[in-house]
Amino acid sequence: MRAAGCGGTGVAALTTKLSRSISQHQPKSMPQASVNSEQNPSVPNSPSAHKPARSQSAQSAPSRAKWFVRFFRSVFGYRKTSLTFLVALVFAATLLLSWADSSLDFSVDMPTSKHEQAVLSRSWESLQKIARTKHTYTSEGNDEVHAYLEAHIASLVAKKPYMELDTDKNGTRRVMFDVKYLSYDSVSYYESNNLVVRVNGSDSSLPALLVSAHYDSVPTSYGVTDDGMGVASMLGLLEHYSSVAQPKRTIIFNFNNNEEFGLYGAQAFLAHPWFSQIAYFLNLEGTGAGGKAILFRGTDYGIVRHFSSVRFPFASSLFQQGFNNRLIHSETDYSVYIKAGLRGLDLAFYKPRDIYHTTRDSIQNTNIKSLWHMLSSSLDFVEHVSSQTIDLDEEVHAEAGKRDLALYTSFWNHFVVFSVSQVVSANIALLVVVPVASLLLLFIIFRCNKGWGFNFVNAIKYPLSLVASVLVLTFVSQVIIVPSNPFLVNSSIGLLVATLFSLFLLLNYIVLNGLNLVFKSFKGHQHDEKLIVMCESSFLTWILLLWSTVKLSHNKFGDDHTGELFIPILFSLQAVACFLGFLGWCFKPSKKVKVSREEHQPLLSSNGSNYGTQDDDDSLAPSSSLSLQSGFSENCEVHETKSFSYDWLVQFLVIVPISSLIIFNSGSLILNGLNKSIQESLSAQNLIYKFIQIFVIVWSIPFLPFIFKLNRIIVLALSLVLLYGFFAVNITDAFNDANPLKLRFLETISMDTSPPTNLVTVSARSMDVVKDILEDMPSLKDSKTELSIDSLGDGMSLYSYETPLIPHLVPGVKNLTDYLSIDVLKDSSSVSDSPFGLLTGELKINVPRNRNCKIDFNMSNTVIKVSDTKFMESKRSPVRTVIVYNEDKYENKSSSVIGAGVPEGFSRDSKGNSVFKDMDGISQLQLNKLNWDKPYHIGFQWVPEIVESESVWSEKIRTKKLGVNIECYWGDLDQLAEKDKAGNPVVQDRVPAFEELLHYSPSYVSWANRDRGMVSVTKYIEV
């Protein structure tokens, strides 16, 4: 029996055989046989006519067979109802699985062993004590945390003879180094008080493993996530190793200080004598507030693959790519260790950034399960590396440039990692094999005349739809959404993604089906259009894969592509689905001569070959290479069989579920890590909206081959989401209690005026709401002070006003002028050097109860003379050498110390003074000391006018004067207890202006520090 149509293929052969088998075993009805016998005497009567009547059960067998086939086809055929059900199921599964993967409740189990429970309990108790008060480096709370840690660590170390503690007491370990990262470009002097613990291993020949975290916080934060969690995890590790057998490998713990404003503690540790033992490291950090700890970065594939030993791995090299390409504007101690040649990992909390560095980074906004996730990951990794010899031990001294970077990801506690070379090799294979195999199959299809009516109209529909939809999506995003509510992503990133995703799918649905209506009379215009869309999507992914492969093969810092592991996976899924379609056409019988309709008969029913409901929504698709109705018109050639195929189902299951999950999971991970950075700059805002558009487009592509058959229910649902989204965009608050507006505060007292000015500055995005909040402060309204707004560029503004609220930073200090005084011990007029020689300056800076000052050397006085006699401002500082004296000596023969014999970089003179020389110029000197009351005593040498190579340096006006600006910071926010004149105790806020802002700001505002402290005092002098 032959059937009319163009739709059968080889993939559906089993279905065809099933239909034939049922047809062959189906009994003929008695009346029909009699009629045939009577009408055609030449045909003998059917034997069945002489057989006794069948039983009722035998007669119902055909009905049961027909019912089974109908059910099978109605469920698995290419019908709108079936497709709609699967699409809805994929959406639900994607959202649910992605949420569960990032959820602590569903992906992390609490410890079950008594030992781990005890370790976690003590670690949580330690975290509570660390976070009892704010403890920035410039606060007394920092000393309290240091004292607690030292006592607790000492008690643990005492339990084992092979454990030892080293403390940098009283600033005995003094270092100087240049700090050049992010916005920092300075030379720093630092007195370390790190707490360093060594757990000596049984095999001293093995290189040591470093575990590092910092115990300081920013002035406005309790430092729970940043970085109390890391410190508590390290205490948990020490607790563990103080109660188990000696590890094979030595483990060194660096509890370092003052990370927040220059990574000082980690940098100082490089000078520690134990550092030379170390080859590997694990850095514990927090750039968010709670949640799950994610593997941010890894130095290379060799060390990253050992992260598979972790029981609850949570990782994505997308963050590594973001860090390496400077999309994330923060740094961790990881960067110090990697520059020192170590190999290791950066494990950190990553969201949300609007709570990060604010008072909301507290115990109440985290939980013990977050701590357990970081602690368990640290415990597993450290135990794995320290308990055995690993393969990396043989290549400890391998050059960093020769190490292969890693691409990695995780899902539901399964960790996957590949090296760059492995991915590049696999990508090249895919780039070559897939096109060759596809062309071979296409050659067979067209060479053997399989009847695929591919033409220009088929090819152009999808690109037209894609381009038109992208243009409309961009217009809606940039012209409608951004102007109406630009900061919406801060609070409602899901709403925005859902709205734009619905819009993009609907646009493609309308355009593609609209083109089908326009070309309805065109022969073959719908011939297997889903396969054509798959092929074109596969081609686009192939181009993306080619670009990614080229970039990966030349991967470098600043142009990193190690987060693109998903690209070859998505391309492979697209390619497999296309192969299925091509194979179906290859096994399809060749075209035959058209025969009359009367020669054909339905397989199972005289009513037609289309089973199931005849409603348009549930009709079997006529647009599949393997569909039940692949003929488009009566002019279509006839084939040997008509197969009721289900290739669409296989293709759907190959492409859509996995692709949707990978794309959504990766995209949501990035957005959750970046969306709060919209408050940090206009460029960050543009980046986020651009990424949302890319995310929506990429997430839609797996669904587009099947967009033609979307049920009206899905279309209605998408329309409702779109309408609600457009409505909600205009009424949803960008900032609320859960997603606060983040403002940054600094109060600056300038000694350059008389009386001193007391100025509050607040930095934030340029928006009216900030102005309204500040102008509503009682002190502004009472003093009738005018708010000044200055642009900082990149969408940021500086809001400033003079405040009558005087800070109380130090007990006993009543006058603002007592906070900073400068003694000039030596200036340019005190030496007889020629204008072309080095001039020397020496200062004593007196500041009570202070730990941090910054000195900027004025570059505006220095010009460079070029050959065309024009003058231009030099960006180089005239200062070449700085010295920090250990003792408070006012008469120091610095000229004999600072001379031509001083080496570049950091050195110490014969008296132990710290010297740093940089012939490129020193524009800023950061001073960090541990003694609260000791003055700063510094010296420096500069070049007022000198010939170096082709450049001539000279002063603009004051040939022998150097501008020096001193700014000192206080960061303590605890209340100050004093006694009044009558001897009664009086408690005062240290920074009343900040407390006023905290008290009167709306609940949707969170406050952070602008700089190294909450209050700074400045003074400008010339020497």
Curated annotation (Swiss-Prot):
Cofactor(s) the protein needs: Zn(2+)
One GO biological process term: proteolysis
UniProt GO cellular component terms: vacuolar membrane
InterPro entries for the chain: Fxna-like_M28_dom, M28_fam, Peptidase_M28, PFF1_C, PFF1_TM
GO MF terms held by the record: metal ion binding; metalloexopeptidase activity
Residue ranges annotated as Vacuolar topological domain: 102-425, 483-491, 551-564, 665-687, 734-1023
Cytoplasmic membrane side: 1-80, 447-461, 513-529, 586-643, 709-712
Glycosylation sites: 170, 200, 490, 675, 815, 858, 892
Protein's UniProt name: Vacuolar membrane protease
